[in-house]
A protein has these predicted regions:
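Terminal peptide-recognition signature
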Residues: 22, 67, 86, 130, ...
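Sec-exported extracytoplasmic/periplasmic mature domains
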Residues: 12-16, 37, 41-45, 87-91, ...
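Gly/Ser/Thr-rich loop/hinge elements
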Residues: 7, 14, 27-74, 103-115, ...
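Single conserved hydrophobic/aromatic residue that forms the stacking wall/gate
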Residues: 1-9
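Extracytoplasmic/secreted proteins, especially bacterial periplasmic and envelope-associated proteins
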Residues: 10, 31, 35, 77, ...
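Loop/turn elements at helix/coil->beta-strand transitions in domains of secreted/extracellular proteins
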Residues: 16-20, 64-67, 89-93
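C-terminal structured "cap/appendage" subdomains that terminate the fold
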Residues: 91-151
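Short, glycine-/small-residue-enriched flexible loop/hinge segments at domain edges that mediate gating
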Residues: 18-28
Length: 173
């Protein structure tokens, strides 16, 4: 998201839709928590009207409609931190399976053989109460497992539940 969040929002393929599903499943991390928080924390404060026709809602460079986030047990590192921030900032519901508490940042080290690279955890994320996010499992608001027998048939139960829940929220507004 280094090009700026306004640019990211403008390039978002379906930014004219009524809701969005954010899928973090099977993500290995990468410091997205702040960008996701900023992009999805928009609260509508007015609508631009041009000669009697609605042009766009403000803020116009951040998502200001309902959203929901998918997570799973394979999320790692910042893919634990991103849904944690999303949930604790009350941006929307989490759907999927619990995420192990793996939120840290690492220093990447290359050995003499440059094909050997590994990360050493050096940064922890401390909460206001003094505890650390690491080793704190993140529970979803709606716990849903994808069963192997449905996955091999091309069904994504977690995504279906997330879409159904998002549609309920949209219809309730």
């Amino acid at each position: 998201l280094s090009r700026g969040l306004g640019d990211v929002y403008k390039r978002q393929k379906y930014n004219d839709r009524e809701g969005i599903v954010i899928d973090t499943r099977f993500n290995g991390g990468g410091r997205l928590h702040e960008d996701i928080e900023i992009l999805f924390s928009g609260k509508k404060y007015f609508t631009q009207v041009v000669r009697g026709r609605e042009a766009c809602d403000m803020p116009s460079r951040r998502w200001n409609k309902p959203s929901i986030m998918l997570q799973c047990e394979a999320n790692y590192s910042n893919a634990h931190g991103t849904p944690w921030v999303y949930s604790h900032q009350k941006l929307g519901k989490l759907v999927g399976m619990p995420v192990p508490g793996t939120m840290t940042s690492v220093s990447w080290e290359t050995l003499q053989d440059p094909s050997l690279v590994f990360g050493i955890p050096i940064i922890g994320y401390q909460l206001p109460d003094g505890s650390y996010l690491e080793n704190t499992q993140l529970e979803p608001d709606i716990k849903v497992a994808n069963a192997p027998e449905t996955v091999v048939q091309g069904e994504d139960t977690q995504l279906k539940v997330a879409v159904d829940e998002l549609l309920k929220e949209i219809d309730g507004k």
